[in-house]
Amino acid sequence: MKRHFGKWLTAAALAVGCTVMTANAFADTDGHWAESAINKWSGEYGIIQGYDDGTFRPDKTITRGAFAGILDRFLHFQNTSPANTFSDTVGTYWEDAILKLHASGIYLGNQGAALPSSTITRQQAVAMIGRAFRIAPETAAPDYTDTDQIAEYALAYVGEFEARGYLT
């Protein structure tokens, strides 16, 4: 699960920064295994973004805030953000995206904190994607060697994603 989902997550979602880059515009993706997906999702779709310095940093981890931004752009939320109930997002770059996803039941946070600067885990990403696309987890727990390390809230989503072939 770690290798395959990590590669997908990197290719489809690894991006932070403010500048939307066009296809083939990143200085550090030429020859990268995910170059084609990065170019498509950044240039053609405009969903993922690079850094202001013209790089994409395809092997860098992604934060919870950046992932929220990607989901927000993908889902095209039109609603305005509700009042902020998170103690750690006020004035941050990702505040609006996090609040819209939270109002939609996609981004849940943790004990009053959104943790936007924390690296997103695979199980957090799977649960957010599952909630975003209303994928009903109906499958038993997955059969991975590290299943005991998957949080209870994400276990059914991981099992469902495995059953559908999204995770291996």
What name fits each language-model region?
Residues 2-36, 47-65, 71-96, 103-123, ...:
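Feature responds to low-complexity, polar/acidic, surface-exposed segments characteristic
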